[in-house]
């Protein structure tokens, strides 16, 4: 992502593309972005591989103005929050994905003013890729279900 300057282009992006296809959604019709605008990583395998590290709260808060500017420009009706970091960036640090995955959530008024946007939070594709096979299959099905629900929310 960092090298290509686009979100979701690696293994997690390929999983997202497959899930979108299985949900009947054309990625070309979506606005896809990252909640955190920089890539923090740890080098492994003699620097050939970069492992993403979860941003801390300060980094999430620092990037929030850019995310809000994007949302105000795009004016989405439904925002799909992929993972806890994205969800907490808009819904607050107390948000728990495990408790609210798949629910229709009201975005705070400062997110997209004068626009009744809702959100649905679901697992980040990279977290699904890290699960063992039986759990991965179930989490993938949940992701597809949540993506289908986001389409239903459009009416």
Provide a role label for each language-model segment:
Residues 1-155:
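A polyanion-binding, active-site-adjacent surface
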């Amino acid at each position: 992502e960092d090298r290509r300057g686009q979100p979701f282009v690696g293994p997690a992006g390929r999983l997202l593309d497959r899930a979108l296809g299985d949900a009947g959604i054309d990625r070309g019709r979506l606005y896809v972005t990252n909640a955190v605008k920089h890539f923090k990583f740890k080098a492994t395998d003699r620097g050939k591989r970069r492992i993403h590290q979860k941003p801390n709260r300060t980094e999430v808060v620092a990037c929030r103005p850019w995310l809000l500017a994007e949302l105000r420009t795009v004016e989405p009706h439904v925002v799909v929050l992929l993972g806890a970091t994205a969800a907490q960036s808009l819904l607050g640090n107390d948000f728990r994905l495990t408790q609210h995955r798949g629910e229709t959530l009201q975005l705070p008024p400062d997110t997209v003013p004068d626009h009744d946007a809702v959100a649905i939070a679901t697992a980040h594709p990279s977290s699904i890729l890290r699960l063992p096979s039986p759990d991965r299959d179930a989490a993938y099905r949940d992701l597809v279900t949540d993506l289908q629900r986001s389409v239903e929310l459009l009416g």
